[in-house]
Amino acid sequence: DIYKLYIGEDGRKVPGSIHLKPTFLQNLVFFFDYQLNWMYWRYFLWNFAGRQNDIHSPIPGDIFKGNWECGIGLIDRIRLGDQSDAPAYLKENKGRNHYYMLPLLLGLIGLFFQYSRDRRGCWLNFLMFFMTGIAIVLYLNQSPLQVRERDYAYAGSFYFFSAWIGLEVRALISRLVRSKKVVPC
């Protein structure tokens, strides 16, 4: 059981049972490392940074299965180690997509652009992004080893982030107009 990896042998003994009760700190580590990092941010970055492959690994930290991978060598080597020695079935996996973090960067530019122009709208979009993403993680409290990937639960969050990608286009046009390289229509 994945949850036992986070408890280890350090949990508190439950009287009359062989089970260990996790401490509050162990629960927090599980929440941040597994539920937020592995079950939310990994899916988020698959869509906006890139995906290593489509092989499911229920174990967080498996460097060859199901991670996000952007295609920028330095970043990928720091996170996952040298992948050049990986077997061909991993290198040539059809689920492998490298977006070089461009959608992520465009979305962040759109976020800052909206914040500078319309703080109220930005906060609304951020709250919807949060409520359909991280708040769903809190609400669902998914246990490890699900029957299938549950990334569809976070689709709303990805839509709201995509709105910021669209706003980046507006930021780019605004910048070009100010620099007099483009005449506004």
Where are these regions (language model features)?
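Transmembrane alpha-helical segments
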Residues: 104-111, 161-173
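Aromatic-anchored segments of alpha-helical transmembrane domains
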Residues: 129-138, 185
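Hydrophobic alpha-helical transmembrane segments of polytopic
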Residues: 106, 125-132, 160
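Hydrophobic/aromatic-rich transmembrane helices and adjacent perimembrane loops
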Residues: 146-170
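Signature aromatic-anchored transmembrane alpha helix within multi-pass, membrane-resident enzymes
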Residues: 115, 119, 167-185
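Lumenal/periplasmic acceptor-binding loop at the mouth of the active site in multi-pass
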Residues: 1-111
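Membrane-interface catalytic loops of GT-C/OST-like multi-pass glycosylation enzymes that act
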Residues: 93-96, 118-121, 138-155
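Membrane-interfacial loop-to-transmembrane alpha-helix junctions, especially the N-terminal start
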Residues: 99, 117-129, 182-184
